[in-house]
Amino acid sequence: SGYTYRQDLAEMSLGLAFAAFSSKDSEYEDQLATSNRNFISFAEQCGFENIRSNKWMTQPAETDSIGINCASKTIRDNGGQYTLIAVGVRGNNYHAEWGGNARLGASGEHAGFAMGRDQVLDYLRAYIAETGITGRVKLWISGYSRSASVANMVGGMLDDGCSLGARVSLSPHDLYCYCYEPPMGATKDEVQGRVYENIHNIVNTNDLVTYVAFDSWDFARYGVDRVVPTKGDANYLN
């Protein structure tokens, strides 16, 4: 179940998040066509098929764009057949998208991260339709920093009943959402009093990114914060 935190899956999910970065050579505009090559390699080595990326992985980024990568494969679990969909959201080497990090909006959730969330959901629905996926699905989504907040908000929307299309079904137990160093993009009103324990936030309290947008401005994260050890802990050496 996605509600159970698993260290092995957390380590794989960090790999998924890193693989979703634009490749280092994409810093040069003439190399953008292959900027998703790390995700392709990761997905192929994990046995996935139907490996696709949205246009922003291979075009110059804009302020409110976001890179999205998807892959899928058929698996069997608990005696049943599912399509496992892996979603890696770009969280580094995204150039102009830095501007979207500062788009808080006048009220409510973080406007820039919400735009990213909506793009991920739209692309995921299109991916499911274009690849002909039907029936029960398991969704594995991961992101780092900016894209961790986006993945976090995607998980929150799905837990709240957002549909991925009439031809597929997703149980909350089949959502595996791992977010690394996520900023806070949701509001306290959205997350309080509800259960989002299939969303796992791996947080280093020494990272300033995890404190924005600010708690004092009523921002929050979906899910469970899992704080990594720091030298400030009394039992750090243990």
Predicted segments with their positions:
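The feature captures the conserved acid-bearing segment of alpha/beta-hydrolase catalytic domains
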Residues: 167-238
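N-terminal low-complexity, Ser/Thr- and acidic-residue-enriched intrinsically disordered segments
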Residues: 1-60
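Short, hydrophobic alpha-helix immediately C-terminal to the catalytic nucleophile
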Residues: 152-156
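A conserved cap/lid and substrate-binding interface adjacent to the catalytic center
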Residues: 40-142, 157-174, 193-196
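Gly/Ala-rich beta-loop-alpha elbow adjacent to hydrolase catalytic centers
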Residues: 143-147, 151
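Short, polar loop/linker segments at the starts of domains and inter-domain junctions
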Residues: 30-34, 102-109, 221
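Short, flexible loop/turn elements at secondary-structure junctions
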Residues: 60-62, 91-93, 145, 179-184, ...
